[in-house]
Each structure stands twice: as C-alpha cells, then as structure tokens.
Amino acid sequence: MARLLRPEVAIVTKVGLEHYSAFRGKEAVAQEKGELVSALQPAGLAILNADDPHVMAMAKRTAARIVTFGRSDTADYRLDSAEASFPRLLKVTVSCSEGSFELQTAFVGEEFWIATLAAFATAVELGVAPDLAISRIASFAVPWNRCGILATNGGPTFIVDTVKAPNDSIPAAIAILSKSQPANKRAVIGFISDYTGGPRKGAALAYDLAYQCADQFIFVGENGHRARPSEEDRKNGKFIDFLLPKEASDYVRATSRPDELILLKGSQTQHLERIALSWTHDVQCWETNCGKYIDCLQCGMVEVPYNEHRKARKARARALRDKGMSRSG
C-alpha cells in the first residue's frame, strides 16, 4: 500500500505488540511499519520517535530527511514534560530549534503526548507557524470513543475507550484512571486482544493494574474468571464479572455515584460504549454479535431493538429517497 500511495511524509510513533495476532512479535511489526518509511522519495520527510529503537532503525531504510521527537536529549523535538490528571487535560511542553512551547490538548491521558508531539513536529517541519500549530492542536476534538469523555446529567462521568483493546494498550488506559482526581473510580473491561500466551494473561494484567487504583473492577465477557480474583474480592464486590454488556450496564446504573469516574475499555465488536450511551440515549439494541466494526452512534440504530434494524434501515432509506425526490420536484 505504501508503494502504491508513494507518501511524501511518514510518521512512525512507536512499535508495540498491538498487532501481535497478525505479526507475532515487534520485529515483524517494525518491518511492516518500516515499509511506510522505505516508500519515501529522497525529497520526503520521516518523523520518527527517538525513544524507540525499532522506530529509529527505520532511518536506515530511506534517503529522506529524518526528524526525531521524544524524551531523548538527541531528539529534534524534545519532550520536557507531559502532565494530565483528569479533569485537567494533557499539557505538553516541547523544546526545539524554534524555541520552547506549551501544547494544551483535549486528551485525558499522558500517553497521548507521543501523538501530540509527532503532530506538532510534522506541522512545524512542513512550514506551519508554531503558534498556529499550537492553536490547531488545542482545538482538536478527541474522537468520543477513543478515550473521550462522556459526562452524564446527575450520573457518573465515563472515559470511553471502546475502539480496540489490545493487551499492549491496557496499562495506558488504566493509568488514566490511576492519575485522575475523582475519589471514586471503577474500571469496566471487556474483550482483550493481541496478547502473548493465553487469554489469562490479558485479564490478569488488567485486573492487577486496576486493583491498585479502582474501587471496583467489572469484567464483561467470558474470560472474567481468568483474572483469578481472590474469593475475598468477589465477596466484597471489588471484582465482579458479567457475561453480557446489558447486565453490566444495569449493574452500573443501579450502583452509580454522581461523582465517580468510570473507564470503559473493550473491543469495537463488543460495543461497551452502550453502557455510557444508556445514560444519554434510550438504548434498545443490546445484541452481542452484530458484526459491525463501527460504533453505535455511527450505526444510528442504538435506540432500535436489533431484530428491527433491517426494517428501520429500509424505512430510513425510503424517507431519505422521498425527501430527495420532493426537493428535485
């Protein structure tokens, strides 16, 4: 694909195990991501994470200009600080040849400094004035289901991170909860993917991390037992698991506090976002295997029972068609 598109700019933020199920290791992931850098023409630009040796090794695969960012003292765009503690949003301080700058973002977690710094470096290297880049970064709206905030009226506040849940992303998600200011916190974790070894590792990692910062850990799906909670944690309610998102949603609503923060972390096919949406919408679709790789708001049928979706879509298409005909007439 990179050879076909022939990019002029390549940005590589990091190499992790997010794609472990497909590539089985960081070396293979790095090889695949490096194809983007290899496809650059000599006049192109590669923006690389100076802290990741797998990323920096890609510099050897191109004759294009290399610009680096990261914590390293040798980085062209050096991270001086990254601070986030919800409700205080991420603020990044960066030093470069243009000077020192503060970047205020709408992100809730410190992990997003990587994307923020990469975006700033790319913009400035392409000729955008630093002040304009800072302004655009500050106004960037975070996608609502990628660690977006959904505040409810008189209910809890949700951090919605329900696009994907590779095992490699679990620590950063729970770190957001750990560093947040609200006194009452819960973690709702669903299906975890791309783990090395068996599924117990993913569930156990999530539970071990959340145990240290959350008042309660709620697991949704078939693998809750693999977290191996103690009998005491089950009895006192520190750990609870549900098979279905609807069951978890009903429980959260019945036990919620208006001042609490709840992290929702799961894969896109599980649609845990419905737990938060049930506070702002009349959620009627609780299908567990709809097969859609879009979120429930994109689908547009969250307030329609799943067995009525086809009928509702036909009615909606008919209404749009009739509306178009009336305009043309």
Model-inferred region functions:
Residues 63, 121-329:
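ATP-dependent carboxylate-amine ligase
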Residues 2, 6-157, 182-183, 207-211, ...:
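Acidic, Mg2+-coordinating active-site environments of NTP-dependent enzymes
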